[in-house]
Curated annotation (Swiss-Prot):
Protein name from the UniProt record: Crossover junction endodeoxyribonuclease RuvC
GO biological process, one term: DNA repair
GO molecular function (one): crossover junction DNA endonuclease activity
Compartmental location: Cytoplasm
Cofactor: Mg(2+)
Native organism taxonomy: Bacteria, Bacillati, Actinomycetota, Actinomycetes, Mycobacteriales
Active site as annotated: D7, E68, D141
CDD domains reported in the protein's UniProt record: RuvC
Pfam families: RuvC
UniProt cross-references to NCBIfam families, sorted A to Z: ruvC
UniProt keyword annotation of Zinc-finger present: no
Residues annotated for Mg(2+) 2 binding in this entry: E68
Main subcellular location: cytoplasm
Length: 194
């Protein structure tokens, strides 16, 4: 499975592509950070991100995109810009019929380091080890994009099993409700014929 990991942001947007192998084997194919100047109009910044993502999607043809879920209890403007960048990326994926999955920062940290409260240095160190990179990916947005892709590769089988189980439970619920409805209707008809 080829996964594009995205650490969305207006000033720096981390992009990565990794390929999963057997078990937990993952191979880094590419990583970069798209930068947009803070002083430029929002629409132009989003367009620059969109153009870069379009190029990456056309070049790397990922099977799925993993985007960091926006979370911020500090700066609403930062959270809004991050969400807007993530939306541009999700839209580009939807136009190509590529699945998009969102992962929280704590899910990513837990998947990569075993600790959902790991700091950026710990995440970067583990990403470097997991992917057997010669040097640490910089800036942190690049490491975060790789961590998102790794997280998705490792969580995807579980997510697939959970989705299948939820679908099976929903189907059983529908059948059970149909049976109850049929029994109620039969009981009502039986009473009306007496």
């Amino acid at each position: 499975m080829r996964v594009m990991g995205v650490d969305p942001g207006l000033t720096r947007c981390g992009l990565s592509v990794i390929e999963s192998g057997k078990g937990r084997q993952v191979i880094a194919l590419d990583v970069d950070v798209v930068r947009t100047p803070a002083g430029h109009p929002l629409a132009h910044r989003l367009l620059a991100i969109s153009d870069a993502v379009d190029h990456w999607l056309d070049t790397h043809r990922p099977d799925v995109i993993a985007i960091e879920r926006v979370f911020s209890n500090q700066n609403a403007n930062t959270a809004m810009g991050t969400a807007q960048a993530g939306g541009v990326i999700a839209l580009a994926a939807a136009r190509r019929d590529i699945d998009v999955h969102f992962h929280t920062p704590s899910e990513v940290k837990a998947a990569v380091t075993g600790n959902g409260r790991a700091d950026k240095a710990q995440v970067t160190e583990m990403v470097t080890r997991i992917l057997a990179l010669q040097q640490k990916p910089t800036p942190a947005d690049a490491a975060d994009a790789l961590a998102l892709a790794i997280c998705h590769c490792w969580r995807a089988p579980m997510l697939g099993r959970m989705a299948a189980a939820e679908e099976m439970a929903a189907e059983q619920r529908r059948k059970y409700q149909a049976t109850l409805k049929a029994k109620a209707k039969a009981a009502q008809m039986s009473r009306s014929t007496r």
